[in-house]
Amino acid sequence: MRDHVVAVDIGTGSARAGVFTSRGALLGKGEHPIIMNRPRENHAEHDSENIWAAVCTAVRAAVTASGVDVAVIGAIGFDATCSLVVRDTEGKPLTVSTGGEDRFDTIVWLDHRALAEADFCTATKHQVLEHSGHFMSPEMEMPKLMWLKKHLPQSWAKAGYFFDLADFMTWKATGSLARSRCTLTAKWNYLAHRQPGWQTDFLNVIGLGDLRERGNLPEETTPVGESVGTLTAQAAEALGLDRECHVGAGMIDAYAGALGTLGGHAGDLDALEHQLALIAGTSSCIVSFSRERKRSTGMWGPYYEAVFPDAWLVEAGQSATGALLDYIVGMHAAGGEPTAALHDRIVKRIAELRAVEGDAFAERIHVLPDFHGNRSPLADPHAVGVVSGLTLDASFDGLCRLYWRTSIGVALGIRHILEKMHDYGYVPDTLHVAGGHVKNAVLMELYSDITGCKVVVPKMNEAVLLGTAIAASVSCGLYDSLGAAGAAMYPGGHERLPDKRKKTIYDRDYRRFLAMYRHRAELESME
């Protein structure tokens, strides 16, 4: 019986794979790094063939580690960052790089080369922007495509296929040109609640009237949990699987994480409205679901059926969180390469210093964490970070103080987002956290104490892989819905309640946080 699935998660720096049972048990994992090219500031590029090779290596390793026979694997699912893959009319790599190398055919999600194009889209005030928080982020695909057409016209002229990275993976696996409703709705300004979903007038206004024809983009989308086909002979051989293995519609990595963290509530939309998924690693993403469409200024969405049927999804986030802490560690005189061991050492020392100094520890340092722009709730990709309260202290303890207060700034940013969501009618009271941040005791404490929310950490910290596995299990018929699959496969979680004794302290920090935003705006407006 084919009662196992393979889940693949393609992140910024590696491809990971896991083999799951139909009850959500992870039997084996594999991981392989992927390369990134950084030819200029704000430019980041992948080689999609390198990614495919990394995926194949990771899948083979996971299957070997699991000890299962490939004949029991019913489906493989892919999630990925919202990176843009460009292929020519023959399906071969086509350069997106100013360096001209064809192998670099993928603009990475975090690439901000298209700031001007994003601003142009925002200035149109087109109705599609009502579903992206009334602004366009350079991390969306339309600005990236506009940049490509303007700055690399030779690549645009040769283009035959445009893919979100997750859709590229399902194409490589099956040969199907189907696109996921998850990817197109969230990153391509496709309106799944309308017919037609593509808004031709918007494409014409931004100079992409030929996009669908040029990129082989279909009119209809494939919902999460549906199969787009079975593996081709070539893909089956490369992955070490067989041709009867189904391939589920692709997912954006953060939304796969939301499905994995909120899976236990997936069958009850009313309960789901009180839950938030916080997928926190290099950056942080908050995902919320609701039965009714609600205001979303400063956030991405609302997107119809991006994950669950008949549900609206809204996404908020911070463009650099784990990356910001890495930066603080790397730039400080007492820091260095931001390894996991160094982060652990800093976190341990912070606990020691707090035990001695109490609530006064580093209290005069204040940080606005917008070092890579403010995704939410200000929707300002041009925003910059601010640090107040520095001295000449270059010691390791000085680094720990700055790290602590930067972590507070990150958590205050989450509170800022949640308060805006409450203003818009969202009713979350529980944060389900997944990703690298769950390994950081400082952040996990602050997320609860600063937001006032109950924090839940899944018992298995592989929420993104699990979410992809849940969707894959539906695509091969193990379950008839995402709700049924989530109820069966979600492992439960550990809860942490906020320390009410800290409320006064962090309320004051939040007032200072908002004051710093006002002061930054005042400084930047001076002539």
Which role fits each region the language model picked out?
Residues 1-96, 130, 158, 233-237, ...:
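N-terminal glycine/serine-rich phosphate-binding loop of ATP-dependent small-molecule kinases
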Residues 10-12, 23, 78, 125-252, ...:
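Gly/Ser/Thr-rich active-site cleft segment
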Residues 55-74, 152-156, 202-214, 237-239, ...:
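Phosphate/pyrophosphate-binding loops at sites that engage ATP/ADP/AMP, CoA/4′-phosphopantetheine
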Residues 119, 252, 256-261, 318-322, ...:
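Glycine-rich phosphate-binding/hydrolytic loop that grips phosphoryl groups
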Residues 131, 149-152, 171, 175-176, ...:
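A short helix-loop
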Residues 139, 323-326, 330-334, 476-527:
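Acidic, glycine/GT-rich loop-and beta-edge segments that sit at the periphery of enzyme/chaperone cores
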Residues 192-309, 320, 442, 447:
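ATP-dependent carbohydrate kinase catalytic cores
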Residues 357-459:
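Activation-segment/catalytic-loop signature of the eukaryotic protein kinase fold
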